[in-house]
């Protein structure tokens, strides 16, 4: 049930062998080999210069790469049939002297929780297939208004991991594989977004996170992933899990490209947004680390007891790079907040929000969590239980008023675990080894974090550093992460 391609034949229009082959007019300049790993700026320069390749050519090149490589990776769940037509129109705009912005003509990928007009939005679940979105999520419109091209939707851990299945597996898309090694952990739930960017199937992707769903797969697949402050970006039109933690976020192969994408994603405000007018690329300067006070945990306190934290040899190298670039390193203690009530609160949120979303979404075969569970039972068979977490969610009961009070108390406690050392030591940011699971507390707090490649393990798999800070500290985090990335030069490409 959990093997590659499981269930794909059920809906053959979205299996790889049936992805639409779109006709393309002759392209004057072929897209050269290696372009799949070019930065956004490099792609834009090529498309802007006389004799350079076109956006249409780039889309065609990446579509062919998807058809060649993705049957093994299972990172893409559906190609956008309008991508080439959109590329042609944007090429014409460029020829007429109209360039919408840095993302003009740049292909992007969207996680399959993000509503995209004319395409399925299923969170990887067959139960949510059959009614293409009638309009874009506002976030998608923001990106399109900046000239981005939706190339495809990406596979993911089904229902953002709340079905209880392995990371990267969905009934609709099969098992996403880590491009660095097919048996390595791919992470979740934005598995396909991270794997596809790492494999050079697109330069940019949008993931979404409740807890770890951007940070974890980005780290494990060796790309940059930013989990923004909750409320910074518009969440309308994205299949929800928890209003207290949900946020979309950009994924790319460099911090600069993540910053470019964040600019486009926060281009407009909504009732949900806490955004401020800022160009996130302006602070990405060569000496960004000089004088920055960066805390790193050497101890942690749990249940009132202080314990030593053993950092990896790779993390020690990360600290050496930061110090060599002029950062002031400050050893700190991190308090571990009490998370004993977290699961009950989260599952109650998921039940309320998923039921609300399904009830409003038109044309789906299921209209509630109960119907979704029944759909899966009828399809998979009652004797094979592949949805233990869904049943647990559906059985959860919490009074809404007491739940909100408990959430507020929990969030404040988790925020203080980050705020206290930053205030005490006058820190600009905190850095930790990704393996310390620091992303969990950052997610509960609703605070931002960014993961950056830091090297490889003895087995050649990516390692990562995790930078995080207080609410709306994205400009500082991006600057620090960029400075580290440029000095470390630790990103690696998979051998495909």
What are these regions (language model features)?
Residues 1-86, 317-320, 324-327, 374, ...:
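An N-terminal boundary/leader segment
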Residues 31-211, 229:
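Gly/Ser-rich catalytic/binding loops embedded in alpha/beta enzyme cores
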Residues 43, 123-125, 177-182, 189, ...:
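Flexible glycine/proline-enriched surface loops and loop-helix/loop-strand junctions
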Residues 45-52, 63-71, 81-84, 88-96, ...:
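Sec-exported extracytoplasmic/periplasmic mature domains
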Residues 104-123, 288-299, 348-413, 453, ...:
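Short helix-loop capping/hinge segments that flank enzyme active sites or metal/cofactor-binding pockets
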Residues 105, 145, 149, 202, ...:
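Glycine-rich, small-residue loops and helix-cap segments
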Residues 227-313, 489-495:
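A short helix-breaking turn/cap at a secondary-structure junction
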